[in-house]
Structure formats: structure tokens, C-alpha cells
């Protein structure tokens, strides 16, 4: 654990502590932390402003948190080392918030489609009980970034004995999540998983990576010559400014001592 980069280490610690504390609070005091901190529909009485942030630190069961934290450990640690703690934390949180936003949009569409079939009371009751928890949205964003930055890295999927490139795995996951989400929307395959939130994490991760690229941020391993030229010019310019500043100070000191 000590060898892990800073943000990855604290994300793992925070998620596991919150998971076990929420279980203790529910069993011993009857406090449902998932109902308080989980993401609810924005127009329901159960919604609170902190939920788009807190929901990504809550998990339904042990397998839920283990799979998410395994991905944080495998892929997040690499991004944490490559980007640095500050940039990686920003990316993780943005992906989680983006996943929450997409999930809210999906709920809005679902509830509007129910208007022709159900009465207002039934819709309000259904909206009140809509809840999403888990770091999966942020994790899918992390997976997307790994495939974006290290596309040719060989990876293995369970029950498939051959290595698959990271970019291919990201595409496969995105397609599976899209079809599963559409199945939930149409009622052909309901599995109580926020598939569109996963896609939302990927989408907002992609948008953030594009924003960083357009603002002259370079991915690890890039050999873009123009970036290197600009960096070299910036270094020479800063060095020239430091030399000019030193000369001015020496000149002022010389005339000061001369007057004395």
C-alpha cells in the first residue's frame, strides 16, 4: 500500500473505510448511508446537493467495491504516476460527476416516458426511490484514459487466454454498456445496473482529455516535435529572463557601492 501513488492510495483507503462504516451504522444504528449519500433523481424530495459527489464513494456489497477498487489499483495507479496526484484526482472526480449527470438525464427520459402510462403519484414514488451508488462511473473514465494513453498495452480478460490491446478492451466495454443500457431502457434486459452512468464516465473523461490536449498538455510517450520545440523555447526564454534580472541586480549594486 505504501508503494502506491498518493491519490490512488487515499481513494482505496477512503472507499473501504466508508464501506465498512456504512455497514456498521446500518446494522447497529439503522442509519442507511446509501440512502443519504447515494445519487437520487434531482427533482425528487430525496435528492440533496452533495449526492453527485458522495455517491461515488458508496458501494452496495463487497463484490461491488472489490471490482471497482481493483480497477482503481490496476489502472488508476498508472495514471496517478503518469499525470501526478492533482491531475489524476481532478480527472477521477470529473468522471464521477459526469457519470452522475448522464444518469440524471437517463432518469429524466425514463420518467417522461412513464407519464403516458402511470399517474403522477406513482411516478413521484418511483422517482423518490431511484438511487445509484458506486465508483463505477469514475472507474470507467479511468479505464478509458488508460486505453487512450496506452492503447497498445496487452491486457487479459477473464476466461480469454490471449492478450488484448487496451484500446480494444475499452471499445468492447463501451459497446457492451451501450447495449445493456438500451436493454434496461426498453425493458428487454433489466439488471439494476447504471450502464449509462458508466458510459457517462467515459464520455466526460474523453472530453476532459480533449480539453487538456487543446491546452497544450501532452500525453505520456508522445513524440510531438512541436511540443518539444515550444518547451525548449520556453526554457530558453525563462533562462534569458533570469540572466537579465541578475545583470540588472549586479548593475544596481555596482552603482550603489560606487556612490558610497
Where are the regions a protein language model picked out?
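C-terminal transmembrane module of polytopic alpha-helical membrane proteins
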Residues: 1-7, 13-19, 177-260
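Residues that define the loop-to-transmembrane-helix transition and helix capping
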Residues: 9, 50, 86-89, 167
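Alpha-helical transmembrane segments of multi-pass membrane proteins
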Residues: 16-33
Amino acid at each position: 500500500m505504501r508503494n502506491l501513488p498518493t491519490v490512488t492510495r487515499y481513494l482505496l483507503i477512503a472507499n473501504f473505510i466508508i464501506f465498512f462504516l456504512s455497514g456498521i451504522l446500518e446494522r447497529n444504528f439503522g442509519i442507511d448511508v446509501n440512502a443519504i449519500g447515494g445519487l437520487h433523481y434531482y427533482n425528487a424530495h430525496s435528492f440533496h446537493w452533495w449526492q453527485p459527489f458522495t455517491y461515488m464513494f458508496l458501494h452496495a456489497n463487497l463484490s461491488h467495491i472489490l471490482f471497482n477498487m481493483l480497477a482503481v489499483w490496476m489502472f488508476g495507479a498508472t495514471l496517478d504516476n503518469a499525470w501526478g496526484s492533482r491531475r489524476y484526482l481532478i480527472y477521477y472526480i470529473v468522471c464521477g460527476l459526469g457519470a452522475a449527470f448522464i444518469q440524471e438525464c437517463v432518469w429524466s427520459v425514463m420518467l417522461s416516458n412513464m407519464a403516458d402510462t402511470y399517474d403522477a403519484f406513482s411516478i413521484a414514488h418511483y422517482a423518490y426511490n431511484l438511487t445509484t451508488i458506486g465508483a463505477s462511473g469514475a472507474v470507467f473514465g479511468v479505464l478509458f484514459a488508460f486505453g487512450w494513453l496506452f492503447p497498445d498495452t496487452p491486457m487479459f480478460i477473464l476466461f480469454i487466454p490471449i492478450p488484448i490491446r487496451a484500446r480494444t478492451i475499452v471499445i468492447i466495454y463501451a459497446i457492451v454498456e451501450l447495449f445493456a443500457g438500451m436493454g434496461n431502457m426498453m425493458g428487454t434486459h433489466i439488471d439494476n445496473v447504471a450502464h449509462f452512468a458508466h458510459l457517462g464516465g467515459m464520455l466526460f473523461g474523453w472530453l476532459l482529455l480533449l480539453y487538456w490536449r487543446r491546452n497544450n498538455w501532452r500525453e505520456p510517450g508522445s513524440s510531438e516535435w512541436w511540443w518539444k520545440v515550444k518547451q525548449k523555447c520556453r526554457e530558453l526564454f525563462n533562462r534569458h529572463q533570469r540572466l537579465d534580472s541578475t545583470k540588472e541586480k549586479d548593475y544596481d549594486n555596482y552603482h550603489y557601492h560606487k556612490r558610497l
